[in-house]
Amino acid sequence: MKVKFLHWYNALAATLLSLLGFSSCGSEFGKDEPCLYGSPTSSFHAKGNVTAEDGTPIKGIKAVVVEDYGNAGCYRMDSAYTDSKGDYVTKEKSMDGAIDWVHKEKRLKVILEDVDDGANGGEFATDTIKSENITVEQVGKGEGTWDWGSFEVTANGKMKKKK
């Protein structure tokens, strides 16, 4: 009798668990969208103009976009070199999260480095453009739930000559 009871009990439990398993595969709140896992993403490019203190454009300056974590260090996101007009533009870069969050948290910086040893009209001291002097503008809407769109970072700088 005990064996027969366990047999029926196991059959009933297996049936109920199967039904519960299938019901959990249904749509969530009436939607037929899959659950999303991971991080939201966005893309950005940085641009700007670099001049000497007298307003002369500087060619060959390396502009490095960084996310500054304070004592934990910096994460170099992208870099570009200035042209003869002093302009630089980085390539479109994808990232987890959104660049405007980094900007609002005052962690976004652009480091300007003279890397050509005086070939651009003198040697210039390294300079940092901080978040307060950087603008971030959304230039494209994202598609879907996790794509937050594309952004344009603008950072212009004036560099001082080394003494």
Language-model segments: what does each one mean?
Residues 28-36, 125-163:
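Extracellular beta-sheet/turn segments enriched in Thr/Pro/Gly and aliphatic residues
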Residues 71-94:
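Short, acidic Ser/Thr/Gly-rich low-complexity loop/linker segments typical of extracellular
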Residues 115-122:
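Short acidic/polar inter-strand loop motif in beta-rich domains
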Residues 89-107:
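Short Pro-Gly-centered beta-turn/loop motif in secreted/extracellular proteins
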Residues 52-72:
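Short, ordered, surface-exposed loop/turn motifs in non-cytosolic proteins
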Residues 26-45, 49-55:
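Beta-strand-rich domain onsets/edges
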Residues 1-26:
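Sec-dependent bacterial lipoprotein signal peptides
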